[in-house]
């Protein structure tokens, strides 16, 4: 019996360094996951700002050197000159779709607006981290970000379908047609929206990875607790 007790004590002493190493690895793992999660949250907020800017700003397409009229178009707001002065006449409102020059512009406004609402809802869901399972919240946000990216893709693809409208042709020339800008050019808000698609896809992928890591982290914690209980039971 004394020999068995001594052997058990020696085995327990040998296990201590391994347990300490596992605990250190676990601590670093948790710290790194939290740091990545904070960065993910910050970039999600940045993406939301980009989305709002793309939705509001009327600089998706604009005039060029050879355009008949000066002006610029956004999703739902546009300004065109009259050819006699440098003043621009502005029209369009998101609350009044009848003022939009094309059905494609209406559809694009809807999808980009939906994308904006989804990413804002995703940020609101950050409060769920205080009440719900962390992995579940990450996965909810990931699906919302992925859907937001899909809406952005639809909006950016549908928007050029409205370039054949009379108002756009008045600014860009008669050579303007669907997906052909004529004498006009793509402006920064459209480019920013396309970059936002890539941003949203990366954020959603990262959220899925963080959610899965949280699941594996919980499984490792459960295994560690079971090992401690088994070692204590064997010592007894």
Swiss-Prot record:
Pfam family, one: L_HMGIC_fpl
InterPro entries (UniProt xref): LHFPL
Membrane-traversing stretches: 36-56, 110-130, 140-160, 191-211
Localization: Membrane
Coarse class of the protein's main subcellular location: membrane
GO cellular component terms listed in the entry, alphabetical order: plasma membrane
Top-rank taxon: Eukaryota
Similarity section: Belongs to the LHFP family.
Protein name: LHFPL tetraspan subfamily member 3 protein
Primary gene name: LHFPL3
